[in-house]
């Protein structure tokens, strides 16, 4: 499945006018041909995609736009129908109107868009009422060919109603002849116990191959590229270990605060929101051993093995912060987290965290994995940074700095290596520079699909490689639950940091203490001026 996605999306054309890029006609045919040859992807079958929570923001901003792009580019089975379900009294026209700002439709695509929405329908009902789901099933059965159709249920819902919705899907809405797949959005629980309760509940209703726990970060281009970078290049294998890597830094930075969502965020915090899922998944791809194949089970088994080697996070290796307003800032930058009217007064919830983890196995023993994430920081950035050890036998009198390999996930996907080179001219002194692969420069005519496009297409094709397995989830919560419970019990006051800054200075001190060396001599500048 990985090869299929690579080929089908890398034949598209990149638009420079700000519109969502479209796949070329030849690309559509090539992609469709490869998809239709996949054993799980039956072009002639009828498929029904049901959006539970069709009136919500996630459906409006992500799910409907993604389905439209896949439909527009000819990447879905020919007979695919879309059914929205929510409590609100809505029409398909109302859904279309609310989604339009996010669909990125060009003038030439209006007929295709009308064809897409002609395949849409909407049913209003109660999430806890079996009668509503019986009506939903009757509506699905009224669609052409639906008696044999495959059904995909996307739960774009708050986790508080997962139990009742999944029970009603199981009892009233399952396809008797086709396959059934359920897509579940994070958060997958609040801690280890609640996650186990959710997993037990889901497994009592569905088999593991029917459950798709979606972490959209696993659909991002550079996150998926980590496996190819590691296991498709001979040069990295011998140095990807404790003998050569001094530390690994995984960074997730957002330049905005909670901005009215503080009440929701305050229930979870930055560790649950980003670190326990997105960042830990990236750590797995960096640290795991080579799987036997790219088969979903083989890949997920290796991720579980590396998670089992990580001991729970220790408070002594943690820095927590909370942003405050910048008096000299503009707009929202003047406001701190506690200025958000939806945030409880005096909240000690962290909006920034640095946590150091260690993988206790032969490859990584002693190497710190530094996870750093936060809101209201100085830039938008997500990256994986491997800093290598010093060159032994230095002959350049401490003028050489550590090599680094950086995989930039967002923005402007890139891979670059910081290295030493002779300074040009008559000098014989080392100078820090980079080897650079910036995607939008190297792949000018390539469309990089949205993460949800890849993942929803994976569900149609039956590939679970980029979805979270129940045993992965269990290990992830095992690592962070003791720390989260300690924070909730002791309520340590987070260190204040200014909106638009790099975060608390104490985080830099922690990174330095465990072995990361920030030289302060060099900043990578994108030479392509994207």
From Swiss-Prot:
The entry's family comment says: Belongs to the glucose-6-phosphate dehydrogenase family.
Which residues are recorded as binding NADP(+) 2? Answer: 372, 381, 385, 408, 416-418, 436-438, 502, 518, 524
HAMAP family according to UniProt: G6PD (MF_00966)
Query: Matching PROSITE patterns, A to Z?
Result: G6P_DEHYDROGENASE
Which protein is depicted? Glucose-6-phosphate 1-dehydrogenase
Q: In which pathway does it act?
A: Carbohydrate degradation; pentose phosphate pathway; D-ribulose 5-phosphate from D-glucose 6-phosphate (oxidative stage): step 1/3
What's the source species' lineage?
Answer: Eukaryota, Metazoa, Chordata, Craniata, Vertebrata
Give the range the annotation lists for the signal sequence.
none
**Gene3D superfamilies, alphabetically?**
Dihydrodipicolinate Reductase, domain 2, NAD(P)-binding Rossmann-like Domain
Which spans of this chain does the record mark as coiled coil?
none
Task: List the GO terms this entry assigns under cellular component, sorted alphabetically.
Answer: cytosol
One record GO biological process: NADP metabolic process
According to its UniProt record, where is this protein located?
Cytoplasm, Cytosol
Q: Which InterPro entries match?
A: G6P_DH (IPR001282), G6P_DH_AS (IPR019796), G6P_DH_C (IPR022675), G6P_DH_NAD-bd (IPR022674), NAD(P)-bd_dom_sf (IPR036291)
Q: Which reaction does it catalyse?
A: D-glucose 6-phosphate + NADP(+) = 6-phospho-D-glucono-1,5-lactone + NADPH + H(+)
What does this protein do, in the record's words? Cytosolic glucose-6-phosphate dehydrogenase that catalyzes the first and rate-limiting step of the oxidative branch within the pentose phosphate pathway/shunt, an alternative route to glycolysis for the dissimilation of carbohydrates and a major source of reducing power and metabolic intermediates for fatty acid and nucleic acid biosynthetic processes.
- Give its E.C. classification number: 1.1.1.49
What positions does UniProt annotate as the active site of this protein? Answer: 278
The UniProt GO MF terms for this protein read: glucose-6-phosphate dehydrogenase activity; NADP binding
Identify the residues that bind NADP(+) 1.
53-60, 87, 162, 186
- Its main subcellular localisation, reduced to a broad class, is cytoplasm
- Pfam (any one): G6PD_C
């Amino acid at each position: 499945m990985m090869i299929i996605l690579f080929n089908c999306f890398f034949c598209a054309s990149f638009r420079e006018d700000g519109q969502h890029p479209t796949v070329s006609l030849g690309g559509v045919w090539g992609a469709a041909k490869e998809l239709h040859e996949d054993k799980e992807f039956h072009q002639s079958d009828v498929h029904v995609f049901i959006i539970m929570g069709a009136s919500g923001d996630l459906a409006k901003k992500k799910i409907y736009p993604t389905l439209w792009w896949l439909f527009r580019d000819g990447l879905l089975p020919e007979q695919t129908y879309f059914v929205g379900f929510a409590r609100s009294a809505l029409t398909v026209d109302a859904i279309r109107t609310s989604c339009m700002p996010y669909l990125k439709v060009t003038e030439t695509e209006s007929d295709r868009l009308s064809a897409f929405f002609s395949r849409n329908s909407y049913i209003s009902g109660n999430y806890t009422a079996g009668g509503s789901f019986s009506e939903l099933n009757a509506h699905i059965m009224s669609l052409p060919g639906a008696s044999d159709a495959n059904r995909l249920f996307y739960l774009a819902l708050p986790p508080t109603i997962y139990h009742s919705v999944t029970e009603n899907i199981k009892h009233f809405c399952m396809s008797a002849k086709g396959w059934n797949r359920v897509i579940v959005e994070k958060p997958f629980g609040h801690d280890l116990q609640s996650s186990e309760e959710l997993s037990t509940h889901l497994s009592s209703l569905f088999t593991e191959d029917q459950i798709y726990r979606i972490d959209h970060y696993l659909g991002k281009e550079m996150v998926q590229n980590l496996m190819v970078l590691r296991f498709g290049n001979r040069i990295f294998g011998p140095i990807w270990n404790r003998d050569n890597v001094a530390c690994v830094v995984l960074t997730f930075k957002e330049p905005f605060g909670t901005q009215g969502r503080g009440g929701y965020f305050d229930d979870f915090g930055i560790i649950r929101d980003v670190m326990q899922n997105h960042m830990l998944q990236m750590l797995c791809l960096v640290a795991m051993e080579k799987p036997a194949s790219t088969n979903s089970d083989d890949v997920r088994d290796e991720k579980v093995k590396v998670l089992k080697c990580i001991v729970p996070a220790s408070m002594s290796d943690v820095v927590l912060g909370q942003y405050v307003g910048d008096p000299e800032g503009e707009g929202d930058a003047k406001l701190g987290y506690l200025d958000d009217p939806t945030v409880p007064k005096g909240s000690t919830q962290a909006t920034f965290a640095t946590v150091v983890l260690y993988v206790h196995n032969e490859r990584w023993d002693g190497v710190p994995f530094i996870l750093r994430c936060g809101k209201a920081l100085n830039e938008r950035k997500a990256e994986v940074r491997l800093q290598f050890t010093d060159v032994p036998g230095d002959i350049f009198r401490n003028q050489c700095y550590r090599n680094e390999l950086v995989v930039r996930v967002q923005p402007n996907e890139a891979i670059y290596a910081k290295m030493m080179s002779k300074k040009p001219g008559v000098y014989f002194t080392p100078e820090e520079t980079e080897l650079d692969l910036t995607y939008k420069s190297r792949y000018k005519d390539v469309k990089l699909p949205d993460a949800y496009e890849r993942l929803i297409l994976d569900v149609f094709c039956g590939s679970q490689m980029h979805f979270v397995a129940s045993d992965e989830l269990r290990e992830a919560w095992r690592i962070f639950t003791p720390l989260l419970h300690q924070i909730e019990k002791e309520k340590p006051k987070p260190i204040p940091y200014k909106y638009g800054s790099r975060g608390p200075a104490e985080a830099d001190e922690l990174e330095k203490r465990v072995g990361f060396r920030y030289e302060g001599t060099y900043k990578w500048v994108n030479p392509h001026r994207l």
